[in-house]
């Protein structure tokens, strides 16, 4: 049986737990934080930060969350990245469309997907504007840089709001397929905007193996030519870093809108503070409000309902 092991932060582990909310097992092995069994894979997350993926889809699931650690014995246990879709040498200095998403692990708020075209002649300017991995930037910096970027480079942005997200999820669509559809559409939109200008490459921040990504798009017009995938793609090309900044900027705007609508601050993430906020929203606006504010299938929904019951009893 194939397996992969990755190391993640506590916050990333919490996001993973929420993502697999529908397939969590009631009991967990000793030393584990959670165990989930999505199709073709058993996932066990340990307090040490290590996450073990086992089964025929181990490589696919592990690739959503990070790079697997090098195996100590058998070299065949980790699925190698498909060389056909690995970024080419020298891509950092090429003219590239980069694509990334924000909001997939947040209980409140939409998923925002952005792609941005960074012409090789603009790379120095983008560095001067402060473009880098968005994880290293605070929200005020994101806002400042994004406002400059959207006036400087071609981009495309899509926002999947909660009500539509919940409709798609309830019809059986996985979050992975939603993301694939959004990335493909955003890239298609940007290529049309560029009026015939051809990028040297298209780089997608990898959330699934390329074969799975393209399978999600079966039956649709797929942008495939010169398309490459990599985890941590923000550090490979500035176009992906720019896309991430624009996507996060949009996410912040949407969260502000939700906060105004709710009459309270809507928090990011999926931790206990989010459960409390969701419980407060239920008390103030009714349980039905969750449909337009949250990703209903996350475990936070049931946790918030239990909090409300305790507060009312």
Swiss-Prot record:
GO terms for cellular component: cytoplasm; ribonuclease H2 complex. A divalent metal cation binds at residues 100-101, 205. Its EC number is 3.1.26.4. It is found in: Cytoplasm. The keyword Hydrolase applies. One of its GO terms (biological process) is mismatch repair. Manganese or magnesium. Binds 1 divalent metal ion per monomer in the absence of substrate. May bind a second metal ion after substrate binding. The keyword Metal-binding applies. Pfam families: DUF3378, RNase_HII. PROSITE patterns: RNASE_H_2 (PS51975). It is an enzyme of class 3 (hydrolase). Endonuclease that specifically degrades the RNA of RNA-DNA hybrids. PANTHER family: RIBONUCLEASE (PTHR10954:SF23), RIBONUCLEASE H2 SUBUNIT A (PTHR10954). This is Ribonuclease HIII. It comes from Bacillus velezensis (strain DSM 23117 / BGSC 10A6 / LMG 26770 / FZB42). The lineage of its organism: Bacteria, Bacillati, Bacillota, Bacilli, Bacillales.
